[in-house]
Amino acid sequence: MTASRVLVLNSGSSSVKYQLLDMRDSSRLAVGLVERIGEQLSRLKHTPLAAGGESREWTGPIADHDAALKAVAAELAKDGLGLDSPELAAIGHRVVHGGKHFTEPTVVDGAVLAEIERLIPVAPLHNPANLTGIRTAQALRPDLPQVAVFDTAFHTTMPESAARYAIDVETADRHRIRRYGFHGTSHAYVSRATAKLLGKAPQDVNVIVLHLGNGASASAVRGGRCVDTSMGLTPLEGLVMGTRSGDMDPAVIFHLARVGDMSIAEIDTLLNKKSGLIGLCGDNDMREIRRRIDEGDERAQLAFDIYIHRLKKYIGAYYAVLGRVDAIAFTAGVGENAAPVREAAMAGLDQLGLAVDAELNAVRGDEPRLISPAGARVAVAVVPTDEELEIATQTYALVGSTDMRPRREGND
């Protein structure tokens, strides 16, 4: 296949993030963001990287995703990278929820679109926007393969003992209630990159991946396959996050409805947008929380302590699930940049072979690196995630194969 470029689109409800990559060397040719779609002051920022060009910004009304992608196409064309280029092999789309139906990236057809739409009830904030992005791209280049890469796909290897909730089986099956997990594209990339850092093949490494951003999740990866993950039916379960509560007693919801006279919508907003770090101390930026701690702020300290306590519980649980752990990998905004979080998460875990070297932990960088002491039984690493490269890699691998039929398994 002579065409070697892949355009990666991450379509949100009011934004489109994009990158154009050349898969011959995985280099980025252009990156950009369209935000506040549907508003009078929409904003597009485009940076051509191939020619070392300067960023261009534009502000004005962008009515919908169709207008947004047309604006992106126009910016790319200015740099000789237009969507009509014969060098463009495919467009890869991030799709948040594929249920257990999609276990691999798949070329989009009518049946695939219908299945993504069928999953909207379990991903109401994300799948509609992802669908809009795909359909808009199809309209712009109907002859070009559109590939869906699912956040949930990496987690479909979990055993039923990890994926099932302990509720009535018929009810769970009827409403597709199970642990799906999210951030899978990041967990897949980081687990492989960690194995490479250790000089081993992915199938020979057991790793606990900690994706710590405003949204946060952990996964237990045995030999390159996910066996457990912290997020569940939705991204609300698991770790303490920027604005999400993570794990809690489900009866809190009933209590708030009965005693607090709150509606389901109000409780949903509380747990997803007004909880986690921001609910505990009013901030969801770890840098600001650390600054407040340094000034003696007790609420910030408590929020940090709760965050770390939950993180340690998952590290211990996944250590038990895996049996043997070769590495702990920190990734995403907080995981990559917040040395105090990494230090606190590993503190007191010497009996598990876990520790960080203070000097190595303080070093900042863009490359995967070890922060554990020399000779440590378990490697502790900082591994910057690259979800766009992972989507492009999976997309290119699929369209470069001879079999481009949609890849699905069974029905939910």
Question: At which residue positions do the language-model features occur?
Answer:
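Glycine-rich beta-strand-to-loop/alpha-helix junction loops that act as flexible
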Residues: 11-12, 93-97, 212-214, 329-337
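Short glycine-rich, Thr/Ser-proximal phosphate-binding strand/loop in the N-terminal lobe
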Residues: 6, 15-62, 232
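Internal helix-turn-beta structural module
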Residues: 301, 305-326, 335-409
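Catalytic phosphate/nucleotide-handling subdomain of diverse soluble enzymes
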Residues: 221-263, 269, 332-363, 369, ...
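Phosphate/pyrophosphate-binding loops at sites that engage ATP/ADP/AMP, CoA/4′-phosphopantetheine
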Residues: 75-89, 194-201, 315-326
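Glycine-rich phosphate-binding loop of actin/hexokinase-like ATP-binding domains
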Residues: 154-259
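Short beta-strand-loop/turn "lid" adjacent to the catalytic site in phosphate-handling enzymes
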Residues: 76-126, 145-147, 153-164
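A mobile "lid/hinge" subdomain adjacent to the ATP/sugar-phosphate binding pocket shared
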Residues: 259-303
